[in-house]
Amino acid sequence: MSRNQPPKIAIVAGEHSGDLLGAGLMQAIAKRHPNATFIGVGGPLMAERGMDSFFAMDDLAVMGIAEVFQQLPKLLKHRKNLVNYLISEQPDVMIGIDAPDFNLTVEARLKKAGISTIHYVSPSVWAWREGRIKGIKKAVDHVLCLLPFEKDFYDKHQLPATFVGHPLADDIPMQWQQTEARNELELEPAVMYLAILPGSRKGEIARMAPVFLKVANKLAERYPELRFVAPMISEARAAQFRELVDQYSPELNIVLPVGESRKVMAAANYLLLTSGTVALEALLIKRPMVVAYRFHWLSYQIIKRLFHAPFFSLPNLLAGKEIVPELAQSDASEEAIEQALVQLIEQDNEPLLEQFTNIHQQLQVSASEKAADVVESFL
């Protein structure tokens, strides 16, 4: 960047979580460089910060092996056109946010063309397919890690990396009052609630909701005072879930708020959820949880051969030990999930919540500002 020219920064995000990270980073950079320009791919939050997306971010939000194959021609065309566009624009630095299968190739081609590259959100290379580190080193000048143990992995492989903390730890308050959340959601103030979070994607809900609803039926018999609430990401997913409730749990009294997942978790006493970022949100909101997940059978055959981390849920990975029950595939039976939830309901959870607070404090280090510090070093 010439000292007389405002920085031009390329950012490529592939899904909602990346859009959130990108918007926070753009805000932090713009405070230092009000005239900075941003190019690349982003969603609505990044658009609010001035990103004119090269193509729709949703085109990259493809999950599952079968789905990726179906969309492969479009993805390859997007990638080729994006690389050509970014090389022609010559940004001062390119930041790929998550979406490693797409972004690492883009980053490698830009780095070869002499453009500095940063990857924001470490690929889970520490958990499976460790051999990918060779490709990452060829593609990336610096990795921004959300989790503290990830930096140790990159240090071992001599790739510059910075632990920037997790933006969710900055966004979610250290104490989220249950009473306040219930009032805002118009839930009953003095009864016990179990929040059910079966995923945000259509396929996940189809796979997990029937299991979770059958567990809810059994818990309703055991605890007549227990109430149920299931936040949905959209009206379409709420309609899908309602059909499954009618099929599997027609007698169940369950509320389905749309777009209020964090508030619902704060309002609940206990949580039953799938793996992923939602488990980290649950930890930060500090509610006892059971994590259960069933993968598509083909995905599971691949994962079980390549996955080598001791846990699959973020709370346990961050703690370095099992602090929340996690049940996967055949272990995620209705009986096992019910038993884990009963134990959670019957036990004293204060020691668990103290561990959640300790982890929250470790992750709360102003992620967007620390990430912007690294970007600044490349300008």
From Swiss-Prot:
Q: Which UniProt keywords apply?
A: Glycosyltransferase, Lipid A biosynthesis, Lipid biosynthesis, Lipid metabolism, Transferase
Which terms under GO biological process does the entry name? lipid A biosynthetic process
Biochemical pathway: Bacterial outer membrane biogenesis; LPS lipid A biosynthesis
- What molecular function does GO assign, one term? phospholipid binding
Q: Which InterPro entries match?
A: Glyco_trans_19 (IPR003835)
GO annotations of cellular component type: membrane
Give the enzyme's EC designation. Answer: 2.4.1.182
Q: Which reaction does it catalyse?
A: a lipid X + a UDP-2-N,3-O-bis[(3R)-3-hydroxyacyl]-alpha-D-glucosamine = a lipid A disaccharide + UDP + H(+)
Q: Give the family this protein belongs to, as stated in its UniProt record.
A: Belongs to the LpxB family.
Recorded hits in PANTHER family, A to Z, give: LIPID-A-DISACCHARIDE SYNTHASE (PTHR30372), LIPID-A-DISACCHARIDE SYNTHASE, MITOCHONDRIAL-RELATED (PTHR30372:SF4)
Describe its function.
Condensation of UDP-2,3-diacylglucosamine and 2,3-diacylglucosamine-1-phosphate to form lipid A disaccharide, a precursor of lipid A, a phosphorylated glycolipid that anchors the lipopolysaccharide to the outer membrane of the cell.
Protein name per the record: Lipid-A-disaccharide synthase
Name of the gene this protein is made from: lpxB
